[in-house]
Amino acid sequence: MEEKRVKCKKKLTSTIGTWKYIQACIFFAIILISNFYGLKSFTDGFLLRRAVLNQTSLCENPPADVREWKNSSGCWAPKIFERAVIVIIDALRYDFLIPYNDSNYYHNAFTTPYETSVLHPENSYLTQFIADAPTTTSQRLKGLTTGSLPTFIDLGSNFAGTNIDEDNLLLQWKSLDKQIVLLGDDTWDVLFHDYLNETLSQPAFSFNVPDLHGVDNKVNQYVFDYIKDANFDVLIAHYLGVDHVGHRLGPDHPTMRDKLNQMDRCVKEMMDLLDDSTLLIVMGDHGMDNKGNHGGDSFDEINSVLWMYSKKPTFGYLKQPGKVLSANQVDLVPTLSLLLGNPIPYGNLGTLIPEPFYYYGDEYLSKAQKINIGQLNRFFSEYDLDASDFLSSSVHKNNNSYLDQYFLDFDYARDAFSYFKAIWAEFSLFPMIIGFLLLIIGGFNLALLMQDKSVIFRMSANMAPSVMKCLPVCLILILANNELHSPFPAEFYVLLPSFYILLNSFNQKLMEYFKGFVKLDYFSIFITFLHVCSFGSNSFTVWEDRLCHFLIITIGLVMFCKCFSEMSPLFACSTYSALAFILLQVISSYVTNCREEQGAFCVSTYISTPDNSLRTLIVLALMALSSIILPLILQLHLRRVLGLSLKLYHLSILYFFELISSIFWIAHHVFANDALLEKQYHHVLYSLANTYVICILGVLIWQFFLLSRSKFAKINVIERSYFVFALLYSFLSFLQRPLGHLSLFSCFLQILLLIQLKQWQPSVGHNFFSVTLGLLGLSHFFTTGNQAAISSLDWNFAFIHSKSAENQAISAIFMFLHTVGAPILTCISIPLFSFEPLSKKNRFLINLFRFSFSFILYNLLISTSTVFFAGFFRRHLMVWKVFAPRFMLSGILLVTHQLFVLIQCFGSSVVKFPEDAE
């Protein structure tokens, strides 16, 4: 009976203890949620969407009075063509069509447009076609049909497009009962489904990057018969093969030449089938860089091409002194509108491409431009009522010749375009300031808690009062805010609980607070200060990969010197670990994927396209070797540091997953260099990938279940934690290319070395190691082929599990894990730093919370710095190329780290430690 009562008492004590830990986790979550709202508030003010006007241009309401054209065949101007065939070749760069004396595969393969323009200039017009970032397909189609400028934040809708709700070309054609037929890229169907002829249209899934020919073959199956039958008014044929070859293999690959040759043959056949009343337009929606990407960072990524062809003479070339033959993509909208006889969409910002109108004389061109200017002025007046001074600059003088007046109107239209690009970069300062303050307060809260040795007791004690006092007040204020239509955003009210927590935590004297620091903690503060300040310089931000390597090597040297100051029995082991840490970082620093701004000062060594070079084969061999030695190294680490060892079946499971990973990437290399093998056996890769993912997720779920439900001895908890960490590393490394796999393996080894140094140098505080860990994750973010630039994303990992990415959620998860694999790896290693020999659960959780606070604080300071400088330099020339992408990366990493840290804290609170198992 007595024994039963003791067991019940222990069980009750354990339950109360677990609830106390969960309360501490909830309190921690409140702080992290306030950080999230800080990022959200700043983002809402910084990345604004432009206002969309609902007005629509009407046929009976022309913007300018051109009396001679009142009874013409078109709405506002005479119709020149009855039908149009619009051929979009995705990612078709301008120089792909221009002859070059070199051996690049993408040159001299698509020659028909250039040759026709040279031989028959009155029938053919070829020009550069300049896109505006963002250069995702969805945003480019919006620009090509509305004549407007999608904003930076609209980039994300490329993967979840919605119907366009502003005036556009397809709406205008539909209002005139024109039959619009789509073949190819289904992005058109997502954006303009209501306007398309459902019977004739044949949309094709667009995100299947590994499929180089499927969409193009489907287009060719119908397009030639449709042109021959002429049962359409507007035929849109959107080819994707060039874009997919660029993404998968890069532009300078034999497959690109084959694809461009195919496009050349298609265009020739279309030309033969045209009649005199049909206009053929061939264009790209954007270009690509030398790796096949098109984020919009470089000129090659926005430098597309436009070619127009007609069997009847149509084009007259206007001599403009000092003007290069080029057009903005928005210029197609008014040009195509007047050529086909429909109104120009209301929100258009483009100006006429002069050549199709100048063929009919300078008077005709001037009158057409007058309509364009009238449309621009009408939109201008509606959108910005304070623009009267600017509107008066469009002056029509009676003594001007038609051509002189055209040039005046052309310059005016270009100025209007530039003006709107400027005003759509306006920012809302109030939510930006609120967001910045929330991040600052969150930083103070974490800084105060990380030095508190009774942190779990304090957090669990403060959780209930914080919620009870702040929640009702916040709810009342938010409801009042909605009723009174207050300008304050909801994030403003998150300041209240954050500020309350700060005041409640600020109960230590300042000197007592700093007494908790050790010497190397001050050095880590100095390193953090340097990193935080570096974001004030666009050069340091661009070269952040080198800066991170420098800071980590500096930290390694300090650890090496620290070993000499404490001549302990483990002196030799500590020095060897510090030297190995430095050596691994030096080797990793040679793996880099350059960004455009680094120019000729950087040479990319990251292998993104597999080939049969000796370097690639060596990397594959080293990757296989790392898979073999990984379990052995983990076993050696456990024995040396904690006197433990992995069970045989744990080692066998690790070997199994590492073997599958190596086989997958070796097979991937073989198939990538043999098109015939890939065609026959590509399904083998997808089977391997899916087998790997399903099995490793099953093992991970099994291990988490055991840790939360079973009663283990202390050594089993630690051993299983290391096993789970190794499994997660294996999963993340599987989602890397071979060289990225080696970089992540280096990161894994460096984490183990840091754990050794922490155990063997107990006088070094946890703040030092948490800052080192944060820097290490960021450093290997760069060595795994990434940069703080959209163009560095490797989209192939969205298709690692399947030839089709119709399940976009799974594809997005794989892309995310590939991109931020290294920062995630360092984050999930935090519990391993919290274990101490013979420590109990309470001690482990205190270590875990304090280490987590310090780790999140470092990342929060980085995010706060990028937030501040992105806001401070919001008018800087490089804001959208340097400061904004870095702020977005910091925000993503901070949210990711907070999520994983919370999961770890909640999970650790329910792990069965030995004192629970008695």
Curated annotation (Swiss-Prot):
List residues traversing the bilayer.
Answer: 16-36, 429-449, 459-479, 486-506, 523-543, 547-563, 567-587, 616-636, 651-671, 687-707, 715-735, 738-758, 762-782, 813-833, 853-873, 887-907
- Metabolic or biological pathway, per its Swiss-Prot or TrEMBL entry: Glycolipid biosynthesis; glycosylphosphatidylinositol-anchor biosynthesis
Q: Which Gene3D superfamilies match?
A: Alkaline Phosphatase, subunit A
**Which GO cellular component does the record give, naming just one?**
endoplasmic reticulum
Q: What is its EC number?
A: 2.-.-.-
Q: Which InterPro entries match?
A: Alkaline_phosphatase_core_sf, Phosphodiest/P_Trfase, PIG-O_N, PIGO/GPI13
* Keyword field: Cell wall biogenesis/degradation, Endoplasmic reticulum, Glycoprotein, GPI-anchor biosynthesis, Membrane, Transferase, Transmembrane, Transmembrane helix
List the SUPFAM superfamilies.
Alkaline phosphatase-like (SSF53649)
Entry comment on modification after translation: Glycosylated.
Stated membrane topology is: Multi-pass membrane protein
- Report the locations given in the UniProt record: Endoplasmic reticulum membrane
Concerning its family, UniProt says: Belongs to the PIGG/PIGN/PIGO family. PIGO subfamily.
Q: What is the name of the protein in this document? A: GPI ethanolamine phosphate transferase 3
Protein species of origin: Schizosaccharomyces pombe (strain 972 / ATCC 24843) (Fission yeast)
